[in-house]
From Swiss-Prot:
Family note: Belongs to the glycosyltransferase 14 family. XylT subfamily.
Listed name of the protein: Xylosyltransferase 1
Name of the top EC class for this enzyme: transferase
Tissue expr: Detected in brain, spleen, kidney and testis, and at low levels in skeletal muscle.
A single cellular component GO annotation: Golgi cis cisterna
Gene behind this protein: Xylt1
């Protein structure tokens, strides 16, 4: 009888233990499922590998190292016992045993810091950190499969769940999380959102409510109705007025993509639009399910046209007239003007849309339009982001405008950008289009349609707001039609444009609705409508363009900060590509892309090929100027670093004028600077950066009158090969900067203006040769070694780049980056981190200066110290130098300016100075008479009177 209660207690305990075990197992399964679904993203994140280059920097491979003291390896590194010459494996700290690769991060550095024998080095792989095992794609010069997404789409991460790159800004604990911890952090955010659904899903408190909207504000500055279905309400410019509160969503927002978009959207207006769009789609109120097809053909029309050199030499009796729609942005007005000059003819029409964020270019465009009756600028503006729905809205509104201009009797619609250029003459283009005046020219993808839909994201729902394309979930392609797509550059005849712009039939109406929520809509909308419309038999699979696709360089997912997708961009043409314009296999009349700031020589070659050479002695043919800033723009458009450097440039230029132009006993050539810069230009000569041109006001001390001068500042050479030179010959050049463009392989921050809060990138250019490993060492102005890592250089590598994860702020002064092979110096380069004289565009305050100019706390640029390498590299830290740096950090006012100018003067040269108007200095040259000034003659880009043949060039 005693055993019975014991047995019952034992059974109850066993039952409880079993339940507890089941609960633990269930929780474990749930956690694993959550992580697997998070990792899958859209089902493809894990397969992204190193190709998912959403960030601009390549990720290093930093294996853990178990090595003895560095000094013990130096004899082997220099060729002694145990060393290995060259190097095919990734190494760290000189030669050692080959090690297994694992992805590196700041967390990897932290793990090595906890190692009993920590390595002071990390290891990188070469250019872009990704080598595909697929067969190399054969480059076809006549290929024109133009799509803005990678061909190897299945291997690319299109997830929008990955944490976004953050500047460190004194938050090393966040930046140093290993990838798994970052995923945990993101998962916690998404789980928290799930728990708060219904009260704070928009990222705000439960008491904040947004009033419901039936219609959102338009993107057009003039408030034009772009179409009932083109959804001009997208806030592409990012300037939409924020409402005072958020409204609780009208449905249960459960999709991870929508939740991710809500956590990242910045404005309340955008968050409400995301929630509203998601709910309408979830309730089946957004997307059409079935669309009518009106094409009488059963299959796809395959019309091809041939290039006949003889047929286009004769102008037809009734030549077509063309409406060029020029969609432009940025600040490269001289290049835009040169392109416009090349395509201009008095019989055609030019309608210019300038991005609403490009105010300078818009002002210049208005000035351009006032000179010619057949040039007009849209009265409305949109923010045409890459891949955005706003591009389609821009084209549709432009079409409606052109059709309503009864004084412009055009026959063809051609869209161009400032990066395009003609490769055949206007007469040839007109003769060709006159022969095929009933055709529409679009380039199709030419591959498997299901794969195109998948890689183009047509089966995904996107929304544009806050100048970003947010991915919100999946959707179905409407039934009843064939979906097509390819290039978003096309030539359309007037009849089809009228149909697209004004038709209210089921096809056009529903396609406008569908493509209002589509990524890269202009790459598919016109193709799909044409192929399913009564005009389907007019489609020619050729958009008459050559596009410079180099997907190995152009598909770096460089637009992930703009779209939740992985996109591609064409490369700029270079002189070695000129032969491609002379091909006669198929009719082509335009090419892209061209950037004068990258390479102007190819534009000059093409210009001479089409229109003949300029007269001998024509000035400015090899020069290029691009305005970076002018005083009509708000001062806040300049960074504190740029404003600081421009003021220093002005002071150094005036000192040069005083030393070279001033005569003892006279003050006629002595000046005092007045105010902020008036304008700033980049200056290039023969495609080499020559520096900045700063236009500024001064007071002449002799007559106390205001004058306007322009100063030319050129950077000094800072790359230096070791002396005596080593026998290592692969390194050609090294540079440090920011805004690395992996596609064109250059720094977009020309001049490398850096401040204490910038994150510099080190770049090396290599010649061909055997696989080798080199060591890169970063040294701050007081000889503190801030970072060191190895790079494995493959035999075919041309460029490597890496951004070391340094703690901020950087100590102001001249930094050095040393490159060693087998611990023998090969070369070094220097760069300036400028102390700031401005903070938030105001003179810097003492407490701000101390915070920014003293380096990171305890000079700890990383968790790990590299101090043991100082004696090995003969880099001695001088206490007096450290103390002087500490004193410099407290400088403000004139003392700070003097320190800054001494640093700038060591890395920049004041080349020349000139006056833009009257001056009291008798020996001061006039800017328009120099060869370098932005006021110098530039005939190649200047417009003029229309010539008797109707052209400008």
């Amino acid at each position: 009888m005693v055993a019975a209660p014991c047995a019952r207690r034992l059974a109850r305990r066993s039952h409880s233990a079993l339940l507890a075990a089941l609960m633990v197992l269930l929780l474990h399964t749930l956690v694993v499922w959550n992580f697997s679904s998070l990792d899958s993203g859209a089902g493809e994140q894990r397969r992204a590998g190193a190709a998912a280059g959403a960030a601009e920097q390549q990720q290093p491979a930093a294996p853990r190292r178990e090595r003895r003291d560095l000094a013990a390896h130096l004899p082997a590194a220099r060729g002694g016992p145990g060393g290995r010459a060259g190097g095919g494996g990734a190494r760290g700290g000189g030669p050692g045993g080959a090690r297994a690769q694992q992805p590196a991060s700041r967390g990897a550095l932290a793990s090595r810091a906890r190692d009993p024998q920590p390595s002071p080095l990390i290891t990188l792989e070469t250019q872009d950190g990704y080598f595909s095992h697929r067969p190399k794609e054969k480059v076809r010069t006549d290929s024109n499969n133009e799509n803005s997404v990678p061909k190897d789409f299945e291997n690319v991460d299109n997830s929008n769940f990955a944490p976004r790159t953050q500047k460190q800004k004194h938050q090393p604990e966040l930046a140093k999380k290993p990838p798994s911890r970052q995923k945990e952090h993101l998962q916690r955010k998404l789980d928290a959102l799930d728990k708060r659904q219904g009260q704070s899903v928009l990222g705000k408190g439960p008491k904040e409510v947004l009033p419901p909207r039936e219609k959102a504000t338009g993107n057009s500055s003039q408030g034009k109705d772009l179409s009932r279905h083109s959804h001009a309400r997208k806030s592409g410019g990012g300037g939409s007025p924020e409402t005072k509160s958020d409204q609780a969503p009208k449905c249960d927002i459960s999709g991870k993509e929508a939740i991710s978009a809500l956590t990242r959207a910045k404005s309340k207006h955008c968050r409400q639009e995301i929630a509203e769009t998601y709910c309408r789609h979830k309730l089946g109120l957004l997307m059409p399910e079935k669309v009518a097809r009106f094409c009488p053909l059963k299959g796809k029309a395959h019309k091809n046209v041939q290039w006949d050199e003889d047929a286009v030499e004769y102008m037809p009796a009734n030549p077509v007239r063309i409406a060029f729609v020029l969609v432009v942005h940025g600040r490269a007005f001289r290049q835009f003007q040169r392109m416009s000059k090349a395509i201009y003819h008095k019989d055609h029409f030019y309608y210019i849309h300038v991005d609403k964020r490009s105010n300078y270019l818009h002002r210049q465009g208005l000035q351009f339009s006032r000179q010619y009756e057949n040039v007009r600028v849209t009265s409305w503006k949109m923010a045409t982001i890459w891949g955005g729905a706003s591009f389609l809205s821009t084209y549709l509104q432009s079409m409606r405008d052109l059709l309503e201009m009864t004084d412009w009797p055009w026959d063809f619609f051609i869209n161009l950008s400032a990066a395009d250029y003609p490769i055949r003459t206007n007469d040839q283009l007109v003769a060709f289009l006159s022969r095929y005046r009933d055709m529409n020219f679009l380039k199709s993808h030419g591959r498997d349609n299901a794969r195109f839909i998948r890689k183009q994201g047509l089966d995904r729902l996107f929304l544009e707001c806050d100048t970003h394309m947010w991915r919100l979930g999946d959707r179905r392609i409407p039934e009843g039609i064939a979906v097509d797509g390819g290039s978003d550059w096309f030539l359309l005849n007037r009849k089809f444009v009228e149909y697209v712009a004004f038709s209210t039939d089921d096809l056009v109406t529903k396609m406008k609705q569908f493509y209002s929520y589509t990524l890269l809509p202009a790459e598919s909308f016109f193709h799909t409508v044409l192929e399913n419309s009564p005009h389907c038999d007019t489609m020619v699979d050729n958009n008459l363009r050559i596009t410079n696709w180099n997907r190995k360089l152009g598909c770096k997912c460089q637009y992930k900060h703009i779209v939740d997708w992985c996109g591609c961009s064409p490369n700029d043409f270079k002189p070695q590509d000129f032969h491609r314009f002379q091909q006669t296999a198929r009719p082509t009349f335009f090419a892209r892309k061209f950037e004068a700031i990258v390479n102007q020589e190819i534009i000059g070659q093409l210009d001479s090929y089409l229109s003949g050479n300029f007269p001998a002695g024509t000035p400015g043919l090899r020069s290029y100027w691009e305005k970076l800033y002018d005083q009509s723009a708000p001062l806040r458009s300049l960074s504190d670093v740029a404003l600081t450097m421009y003021h220093s440039f002005i002071r150094l230029g005036l000192r040069r004028a005083e030393s070279s132009l001033h005569t003892d006993g006279e003050n006629s050539c002595r000046y005092y600077p007045m105010g902020h810069p008036v304008s700033v230009h980049f200056y290039f000569l023969a495609d080499r950066f020559q520096g900045f041109l700063i236009k500024h006001h001064v007071t002449n001390l002799a007559v106390s009158k205001l004058e306007t001068l322009e100063t030319w500042m050129m950077p000094k050479e800072v790359f230096k090969v070791a002396s005596p030179p080593s026998d290592f010959g692969r390194l050609q050049f090294s540079e440090v900067g920011t805004d690395w463009d992996a596609k064109e392989r250059l720094f977009r921050n020309f001049g490398g203006l850096l401040g204490p809060m910038d994150e510099p990138v080190g770049m090396q250019k290599w010649g061909k040769g055997p696989n080798v490993t080199v060591t890169v060492i970063w040294v701050d102005p007081v000889n503190v070694i801030t970072a060191t890592y190895d790079i494995l250089i493959e035999s075919t590598a041309e460029f490597t780049h890496y951004k070391p994860p340094l703690n901020l702020p950087l100590r102001p002064g001249v930094w050095t980056v040393k490159i060693l092979h087998h611990w023998v110096p090969v070369a070094e380069t220097k760069f300036l981190v400028a102390p700031l004289t401005f903070s938030n565009k105001q003179p810097i305050k003492p407490e701000e200066a101390l915070k920014l100019h003293n380096g990171p706390p305890r000079s700890a640029y990383m968790e790990q110290s590299f101090q043991s390498l100082n004696p090995v590299l003969s880099l001695h830290i001088n206490p007096a130098q450290v103390e002087q740096a500490r004193k410099n950090a407290a400088f403000t006012g004139t003392a700070l300016e003097a320190w800054l100018d001494s640093l700038v003067g060591g890395t920049w040269t004041a080349m020349d100075i000139c006056t833009t108007g009257p001056t009291a200095c008798p020996v001061m040259q006039t800017c328009s008479q120099t060869a370098w000034s932005s006021f110098s003659p530039d005939p190649k880009s200047e417009l003029g009177a229309v010539k008797p043949d109707g052209r400008l060039r």
